[in-house]
Amino acid sequence: MLEQEENGLFEIPDYEHVEDETFPPFPPPGSPERDPAEAEPDEGSGAPVPVPPKRIVKRNIPKLDATRLTSERGLPALRHVFDKTKFKGKGHEAEDLKTLIRHMEHWAHRLFPKLQFEDFIDRVENLGNKKEVQTCLKRIRLDLPIVHEDFVNNNDEVEETNSLDAAATGFDAFVTSSSDSKRFASEASRNLTEEQQQRIEKNKQLALERRQAKLLSNSQSLENDVTVEESSTGENQEESNGLISADGPHDVPSASTQEEGQLEAEETQLDHPNLD
């Protein structure tokens, strides 16, 4: 510790008369104490230094082959390329052809960007003879699953059908339970007491009597309506007969005049037989 003087200053030690610390010298370059990795090659010796071989990483260059053509971005993707495109139809054939070629170029670029569209078409024509490509085209025409997504969609459809079957079985169980409940209700009705059965029979008889009374009242009202209609029709017939009788004498003179004319003609023929 530094001692504090009277005037408040510290006493500084004398470093001039202190000896420096001695360190050991560095070892020579080829000494065994030194790490061989740190040793530098001796240029004057002329010995050949072995050079480690470089590691060459081989990268798989993508090729447009049958497996790539039948992948998800290959021929199966053509099924949905033209889903959102609308062709104009007759009179616009050139525009429709341009849109078709543009979509095909986009599909070819996504599948294999290195080739131009013309070279891509030539390569696809050559690959059309491969068995894998032909089977893929057949599956597309027959609407069979090709990609993993198609199999997943089929599994979803199977699950939906299974759920429908489960719902149907549940409905059948509900129907059977309802039939069981009806059977239990019939058994419970059998187990009714005699007093309850007598009350039920009395209620049935009262309901039948009320129904018969209603039927009788309805039949009486119908008979009354029929009699009223018959009386009204009889009065109408009497009135019509009276009118006919009143009109009859007017027709009698016409008939009598005709008879008188015929008699006069016969008398003239008898009085003048030689006129003919």
From Swiss-Prot:
Amino acid composition bias (Polar residues), ranges on this chain: 217-243
Subcellular location(s) per record: Cytoplasm; Nucleus
Residue numbers spanned by region Disordered: 1-54, 217-276
GO terms for cellular component: chromatin; cytoplasm; nucleus; replication fork protection complex
Pfam families: Swi3
In-chain residues carrying the UniProt-annotated modification Phosphoserine: S219
Swiss-Prot/TrEMBL keywords: Cell cycle, Cell division, Cytoplasm, DNA damage, Mitosis, Nucleus, Phosphoprotein
One MF annotation (Gene Ontology) recorded for this entry: DNA binding
Chief localization: cytoplasm
Positions carrying Phosphothreonine: T233
GO biological process: cell cycle phase transition; cell division; DNA damage checkpoint signaling; DNA replication checkpoint signaling; mitotic intra-S DNA damage checkpoint signaling; positive regulation of cell population proliferation; replication fork arrest; replication fork processing
Region (Interaction with TIMELESS): 64-140
Function as written in the Swiss-Prot or TrEMBL entry: Plays an important role in the control of DNA replication and the maintenance of replication fork stability. Important for cell survival after DNA damage or replication stress. May be specifically required for the ATR-CHEK1 pathway in the replication checkpoint induced by hydroxyurea or ultraviolet light. Forms a complex with TIMELESS and this complex regulates DNA replication processes under both normal and stress conditions, stabilizes replication forks and influences both CHEK1 phosphorylation and the intra-S phase checkpoint in response to genotoxic stress.
Subunit and interaction comment: Interacts with TIMELESS, which impairs TIMELESS self-association (via N-terminus). Associates with the MCM2-7 complex. Interacts with RPA2, PRDX2.
Family membership: Belongs to the CSM3 family.
Database matches in PANTHER family: TIMELESS INTERACTING-RELATED, TIMELESS-INTERACTING PROTEIN
Full protein name: TIMELESS-interacting protein
Organism whose genome encodes this protein: Rattus norvegicus
GN (gene name): Tipin
